[in-house]
């Protein structure tokens, strides 16, 4: 589904996201996140970025990024509760869960100077591939996850091992780089947290 947000709706969604950040995090970590997401830093891109470039993927529209990460956070919490209610052992905090959910696609906000996605210019790609946003060729190539960690480091935002695993493994087995975490027959190399599950 494509949404056509007005400028006022984009601003309201941005403010909702900032309020969610304030509700979950505190202290120095909150200060650094608020700085990172301020309009002078990544905030404008946060408000307008799509979550994907193709129509058949998730939230491929201006403002889709916030919709996507808020949906991931909401659903991750529901799944955690269901897991817990079913007798599962939760060995991570709600803050760790929300940190991973809110930041798993952070790399899609670009590098602070350039956006990750730009409007697709090719009519052929829009018509035949349903590609409405293209990757910005001005950016140094990074995997989305690698750029997410780079951005967090640029802004001095610390994260736990569980948060790093949660972000790193957000795409599950669809990302070749994470298979070594998911598929291990040696007990010493198996996950010691269930946050990414």
What residue ranges belong to the model's regions?
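Generic structural signal for well-ordered, non-membrane alpha-helical segments
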Residues: 10-13, 65, 69
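Divalent metal-dependent catalytic cores for phosphoryl transfer on phosphate-bearing substrates
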Residues: 53-63, 67, 74, 79, ...
């Amino acid at each position: 589904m494509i949404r056509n947000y007005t400028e006022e709706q984009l601003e309201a969604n941005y403010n909702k996201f900032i309020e969610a950040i304030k509700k979950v995090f505190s202290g120095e970590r909150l200060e650094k996140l608020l700085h990172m997401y301020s309009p002078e830093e990544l905030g404008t891109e946060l408000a307008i970025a799509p979550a994907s470039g193709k129509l058949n993927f998730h939230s491929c529209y201006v403002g889709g990024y916030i919709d996507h990460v808020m949906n991931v956070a909401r659903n991750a919490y529901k799944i955690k509760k269901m897991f817990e209610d079913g007798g599962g052992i939760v060995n991570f905090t709600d803050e760790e869960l929300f940190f991973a959910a809110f930041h798993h696609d952070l790399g899609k906000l670009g590098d602070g100077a350039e956006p990750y996605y730009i409007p697709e210019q090719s009519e052929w790609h829009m018509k035949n591939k349903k590609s409405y946003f293209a990757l910005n060729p001005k950016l140094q190539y990074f995997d989305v996850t690698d750029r997410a960690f780079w951005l967090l480091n640029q802004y001095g935002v610390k994260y736990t091992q569980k948060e790093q695993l949660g972000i790193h493994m957000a795409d599950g087995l669809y990302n070749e780089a994470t298979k070594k975490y998911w598929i291990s027959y040696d007990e010493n190399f198996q996950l010691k947290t269930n946050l990414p599950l």
